[in-house]
Every structure is written in structure tokens, then in C-alpha cells.
Amino acid sequence: MNGKEGPGGFRKRKHDNFPHNQRREGKDASSSSPVMLAFKSFQQELDTRHDKYERLVKLSRDITVESKRTIFLLHRITSAPDMEEILTESESKLDGVRQKMLQVAQELSGEDMHQFHRAVTTGLQEYVEAVSFQHFIRTRSLISMEEINRQLTFTTDDSGKESKAPPADGQDKQLVTWRLKITPVDYLLGVADLTGELMRMCINSVGNGDIDTPFEVSQFLRQVYDGFSFIGNTGPYEVSKKLYTLKQSLSKVENACYALKVRGSEIPKHMLADVFSVKTEMIDQEESIS
């Protein structure tokens, strides 16, 4: 029998020559080595970052859902008898969305926004769309990015809840300020999506006998389109991609205004929406063929 072979002819491994307790001490020494400790810290840091990313994705999803519900609510304003009631309800819904925004700001505190931007960009764009839609209904103008960011500045007390009133005399409360800034790209993409909602609002308002809104929307969309045209293909890819959709919305609103001017007296008001919807479908078919 060869000296390197054990009983039964099996070849002995090299570490079999070392006692079992020495092998265990070697493992303990390797696990406490500086290299292993460094990799353990890297693992903890990555796990923490991944968990934060998933929490932000969930918050962004909630913000998107609630913002869409606010937009659906605002579309009822064309047929509702009391506009202020719907605007008040929409403001209440947006306050709930801003509470989610506060959680996003708290998650991003001390972090690089650009590392987590992809997790929250969808929710931020949808929020911009909802806020700008409400602002247009109120003022017939476009809300600025500075105004949106001003609304996303929060002050919380020790418990982490938002505190809108200053602390009373004798109360020693530590207030913390949180800020969440909308990026220019998110603002532009949200405004571009707003044009589609304004186009739907235009068609719905005509169906309810409102002849003034289509012309106000048309003038507003022309100004927005001119602004986006200055950016053109020099801006981010996502923004230039939205330019075609914006042009489609503008052309549909302009066609509605043209029909109102030329044939408005011929067609009964309750049939105008049907005429516009048919024309819109024809335009979509022509664009898909071309």
C-alpha cells in the first residue's frame, strides 16, 4: 500500500494530516481577517441600499396610483355642477400624495438623489401631471417647477409627522425640515403628459356644451408646444420622444376648435362630442397608416 493511501486504498487529502481543531482555528482566523471584514461591510451596505431602493419603488407606485385617481377626479369637473367641491376634494387627495412624498424625502435624506432617481421618477412625473392639471383648471396657466418644489418642503416634529403650525410657547419641540426636489426632466415629462389630459378635457367639455374651454386649451397647448420646440432634440431623449405625442394632442384640439368655428352653428351641442370623437379616430388611423 502506498504511504499516501489510507485504509481501503482511498487517497488521503493533505488537510487530513492536520488535527480538526487546527482546521477550525484556521477558519475562524480567515473569517476575522481584514479582507473578510471589509467584504461583510460591503454586503451590509449593498443590502441596505437594495432595501431602500425597493421601499422607494413601492412609494413611487403608491404616488402614481393616487395621482392618477386625482386626475380621474378632476376630469369630472367638466360635467359637475359644483367645480369648487371637486377642486377641494382633489386638494385633499394631493395632500395624501404629499405625505408619500415626505416619506420619499426622508428615505433620500443624506443620499445621492441620482442613485435612486430611477426608483421614483415615474411617481414624480405623475405627481407633476396631477398638480399641473389642477393648477390649469384653477388659473388657466402652467405651474412652475419652483412652485412644485415649494410645495414639497415639509416640517416635521420629533415623531416624524408633518407639523404645519409653529410650536406653541412653552413647548420644546425639535422641528426638522425635509425637501424633495423635482428634477427638470421629471417636470418636463410631467407637463408633456399633461397635454394628453387637456386634450381629453377639451373633448369632454364640448360634449357638455362648454364652447370656451377648447379655445383656452388650444392657446395654452400652442404655448407649451412652442416651449418644447425650443428644446427639440438637444434635450434628454425622453423629452424629445414626448414631442410627437404633444403635437398629436395639439392637432386634435385645433381640429376641435376648427369644427366649432366652422360648423358649430350647424351641429347640435349634444352631438359635437360624437363628431369630434369620430374625427379623432380618423386622424389616429391616418397617422398609423403613414
UniProtKB/Swiss-Prot annotation:
PANTHER family: TRANSLIN AND TRANSLIN ASSOCIATED PROTEIN X (PTHR10741). Acts in combination with TSN as an endonuclease involved in the activation of the RNA-induced silencing complex (RISC). Possible role in spermatogenesis. There is a cross-link at K279 (Glycyl lysine isopeptide (Lys-Gly) (interchain with G-Cter in SUMO2)). GO terms for molecular function: A2A adenosine receptor binding; metal ion binding; protein-containing complex binding; RNA binding; RNA endonuclease activity; sequence-specific DNA binding. The keyword Zinc does not apply. Detected in cerebellum. Sumoylated with SUMO1. GO terms for biological process: cell differentiation; siRNA processing; spermatogenesis. Its main location: cytoplasm. Mg(2+) binds at E129, E197. Residues 16-28 have a biased composition (Basic and acidic residues). Pfam families: Translin. This is Translin-associated protein X. Keywords: Cytoplasm, Developmental protein, Differentiation, DNA-binding, Golgi apparatus, Isopeptide bond, Magnesium, Metal-binding, Nucleus, Spermatogenesis, Ubl conjugation. Residues 73-208 are annotated as: Interaction with C1D. One of its GO terms (cellular component) is nucleoplasm. InterPro entries: Translin_C (IPR016069), Translin_fam (IPR002848), Translin_N (IPR016068), Translin_sf (IPR036081). The lineage of its organism: Eukaryota, Metazoa, Chordata, Craniata, Vertebrata. Belongs to the translin family. It is found in: Cytoplasm, Perinuclear region; Golgi apparatus; Nucleus. Ring-shaped heterooctamer of six TSN and two TSNAX subunits. Interacts with GOLGA3, TSNAXIP1, SUN1 and AKAP9. Interacts with the homodimeric form of C1D following gamma-radiation. Interacts with TSN and C1D in a mutually exclusive manner. Residues 1-34 are annotated as: Disordered.
